[in-house]
Amino acid sequence: MSALTTRLAGALRDRVLSLTDTTRPEGPVFLAATLGTELAKATRLAPLEKLCKPAIVPAALTLALRDGELAPVDTALLAATGAGYTAGDVILMLGDGHANRSTRRLVAGAAAFGAGHLALGAMMLRAGIRFRPLQASIHGVAAGTASAVLLAGGRTNAPLAAYATLLAALSALATSVDESAGPAAAVLTVGGPVFLLSDALILVRGRAPEGSASARALDVGVIDTYAAAALLLLTGTAAAARHTRAS
């Protein structure tokens, strides 16, 4: 087993334990919010989704912040990320979520998420994480492919193509993390690609027949991957910032 695999396995185990720690509320709240949103998507219970989905990122943010020891700037950047992601959730949720085919609403949601990505990327850079050539190249190909697919649907998709490029850049930076950021930051190598997968599933969901079993399964898959990615990116970046500050 490689050193990276060992660090990643340990960091993921710690994340799971934090979710099941009943001595503090944020882990169980994160699980409840995620499971409630999955149930809402599977059963089309919009009121349940409106109750649960906006709590996913704030719970993940609380998990990321609870160990303290962050510089004020990093705390502000992490909070800005959480605010951007939550705003994006609400914008998309009020527009019928992943089933929405309105480019205008998708662009508005992407703008909110994009602001969160920029804040998180700035925090990663402050923690000393730098792009590595292989990761940047792989994600560059992914960004180019996604942009081509989106632009093939019309020039109105240009903002979404720009968002795809931004997310790919964030994932490239996250997967460039190394041992200098500390063992707990290893989850970033998973968080970035999982966020990419979540957004790719949204594109696939937009082409699924409304009300079909495949559409519902994709909706649940989007929530699964999004919640996991948000948790790993927020907590992993916070861990990297703490380690760098303590070094």
Regions from the PLM with identified roles:
Residues 1-247:
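Short amphipathic, positively biased membrane-proximal segments
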